[in-house]
């Protein structure tokens, strides 16, 4: 028996743990998953944004492919979920405003299930202003509303 454990969240979700799982499957080793903590689920539920259909994007590419990915998501109507570092949060939200429109609804959750848990909701403009005035810290989940059908 082998257990795959992550120090933050569910193994294989925005984590290279899927490589271990893939090798187990390829080698006929049975894999069972126990339900556990995944930051994006409480962030999605508490966002106030539609959660009947969503797409999980995880961490965006840092350089190569980042703008291509954002362009490919411009027409996405489902709620989108991203993980981000506190050091890149304002830059990422600013890029979201450029690609998706400054009035797009967003919820930024940090430190989920910890003593300093915080959710900031509003338009991209409002949330950018909040984090320009209040330095973000901790593990961050961004929940971005999808494009509204005209």
Locations of regions flagged by a protein language model:
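Acidic beta-strand-to-loop metal/phosphate-binding motif
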Residues: 2-9, 13, 80-84
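A contiguous loop/helix-start segment that scaffolds small-molecule binding in enzyme catalytic cores
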Residues: 79, 83-150
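Short beta-strands and strand-loop turn motifs
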Residues: 3-7, 53, 107-111
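General beta-strand structural signal in soluble alpha/beta enzymes
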Residues: 6, 33-36, 82, 108
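Short, small-residue-enriched loops and turns at beta-alpha junctions
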Residues: 10-13, 62-63, 116
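Short gly/pro/ser/thr-enriched loop/turn and capping motifs at secondary-structure boundaries
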Residues: 11, 38-41, 114-115
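Short, well-ordered secondary-structure micro-motifs
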Residues: 15, 43-45, 67-68, 92-94, ...
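Class I SAM-dependent methyltransferase SAM-binding "motif I" and its flanking Rossmann-like core
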Residues: 19-76
